[in-house]
Design a protein with these regions (language model features):
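Predominantly flavin-linked oxidoreductase catalytic cores and closely associated redox partners
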Residues: 1-15, 19
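C-terminal catalytic lobe of FAD-dependent flavoproteins
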Residues: 34, 76-173
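A generic alpha-helix surface/boundary motif
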Residues: 11, 69-70, 129
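Active-site lid/adjacent beta-loop-alpha segment flanking the redox-cofactor pocket in flavoenzymes
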Residues: 6, 21-112
Length: 173
């Protein structure tokens, strides 16, 4: 807002959890869409898992008990064996959530300003491809062919992108 630009994004906390090390149990990442739960295992054996965002805007990097309980319940529904593991720690990270679940990758409304925000849950997973497209956008001062749909003005024009419930209110889609 300091630049006079209102972005259609909200900041929400996404919690993650890790257990004590355990023998190899999970290869890859397992997700449970109905319960908003995901789980994987680190190289050191810790079971890493998480779920839904806290349901309000915040910049705090800590989660709240209702989401903690919901994530644990989803995990135990999918993998009851997790109940025997000791939880070592949990943490929260701030997610910049666009209203349709898709990022904003665009030339900004101010000369020399470029936007790459609103990635919701998975921005780091898309970094190689989006980085290539964003570099093109900066170098040419126009969107790459692959990110032309991800403009800031799509919200004002009503051209939101249906990401199948990946925005800040996934249960509302």
């Amino acid at each position: 807002e300091k630049l006079g630009i209102r972005l259609p994004i909200e900041s929400h906390v996404l919690q993650a959890f890790v257990t004590e090390p355990y023998k190899p149990l999970i290869k890859g990442v397992v997700t449970f869409g109905a319960g908003h739960f995901y789980v994987s295992q680190s190289d050191k054996g810790g079971v890493v898992f998480g779920g839904d965002i806290d349901g309000y805007n915040t910049y705090a990097q800590r989660g709240n008990l209702p989401v903690f309980e919901d994530v644990i319940a989803g995990g135990l529904t999918m993998m009851p064996c997790l109940s025997r593991l000791k939880l070592l720690r949990n943490w929260g990270g701030v997610m910049d959530m666009s209203m349709d679940g898709s990022p904003i990758i665009d030339v900004g409304p101010i000369d020399g300003l470029y936007l790459n925000t609103g990635w919701c849950y998975g921005g780091f997973k898309a970094t190689p491809a989006s980085g290539y497209c964003f570099a093109h956008t900066i170098a040419n001062d126009e969107a790459h062919e692959l990110n032309k749909a991800y403009t800031l003005d799509r919200f004002a024009k009503g051209y939101t992108i249906d990401e199948k419930g990946m925005g800040p209110y996934p249960k509302a889609h």
